[in-house]
Amino acid sequence: MEYRKLQGTDLTVSAVGFGVWTVGTTWWGVKDEQLGKRLLRQAFERGVTLFDNADTYASGRAEELQREALHDVRDQIVVATKFGYDIVNHPERPGQQERPHDWSPQYMRRALEASLRRLGTDRIDYYQLHNPRLDAIEQGSALADDLFAELEQAKAEGLIRAYGTALGPALNERQIEEGVASLRRGAPTQIIYNLLEQVLGEPVLAEAERLQVGVLARVPHASGLLEGYMTADTTFEPGDHRNWRLTTNERRKAWMEDGLKKVEQLQPFLEGRSIGQLALQFALHSPLMASLIPNIYDEQGLISYTSLDDARPLSDDEYGQIQALYAQNFGLNTSLIGEVVR
């Protein structure tokens, strides 16, 4: 496992992290909590140190699950979680709809105390605003300035070691402005980024390079398109979040077909590596990309993603060839990539 500095903080993280939402919710088909805890433990044993959680995942149960799996190695891992959605006054909504945000300093404190309790720890290593809009980030916004001042105070008290933002849930150009605003505060940002979805990559990573503030990326496998198992006939279980993120079965099928046509053109790059490993190597190309947070929901994926040292390295020439394919939209006239909200 490779380890990288999360620039702008004192944290060092595994280049491949673990997004606990895949095992802490039922949105990815892992309904067995014992399996979820085994995967978390196996990830640690295979060198993963960054575990990315959120208080909204199963209304806090995902944080408890992480504690149960990893409490005895707490000081050997980087505990990252998120806040901002009002899970106290607004229960989960059908169809995984967003809950209202509360960015008041008082709510942040309340959320922080609850996460500390559920995670069984005295500090959060990396505390992130969960899907904020620009008014909760930008300098000069009273809402944001008050919130970030309180985050600084919590840091001074030792309750958090570092803070940042996790942007979403939809992938759109609005997040370029949000990501840049976060970096300009000296706060790392987590974005959706993969070789099929690079809307945020170039502008956000360029600003990260200029400011020397780090970036994390989730969904490096484009919601499954780059995992190697999808076909045009793939269907998702009823609780799978991808059923909610595209409005109709026809749109979902079109999204898959569009993505799979692009994936087919990546076959020449698969000598000595799987498609899933290629996706991770590509997204880690920038030195400011501290860690990737793939969706891990079975042992096969876990082993593959934590075995990058065994895969043939991605050369600069190969990286450039893939970028050239992306620049011409893989020769296709239409694109539905980016429609899935994550």
Residue ranges and their predicted role:
Residues 22-34, 94-109, 135-140:
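Active-site mouth loops of central-metabolism enzymes
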Residues 76-88, 191-192:
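A short, structured active-site edge motif that brings together acidic residues
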Residues 132-325, 329, 339-342:
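Beta/alpha (TIM)-barrel catalytic core signal, keyed to glycine-rich beta->alpha loops juxtaposed to Asp/Glu
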Residues 30-43, 104-118, 171-179:
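Short, acidic/polar
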Residues 114-137:
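Active-site groove signature of glycoside hydrolases
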Residues 1-81:
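N-terminal binding-site loop/beta-alpha segment at the start of enzyme catalytic domains
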Residues 8-10, 68-75, 117-120, 153-155, ...:
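Acidic (Asp/Glu)-rich catalytic clusters
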Residues 15, 78-82, 126-129, 216-220:
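Non-cysteine beta-strand/loop elements that form the S-adenosyl-L-methionine
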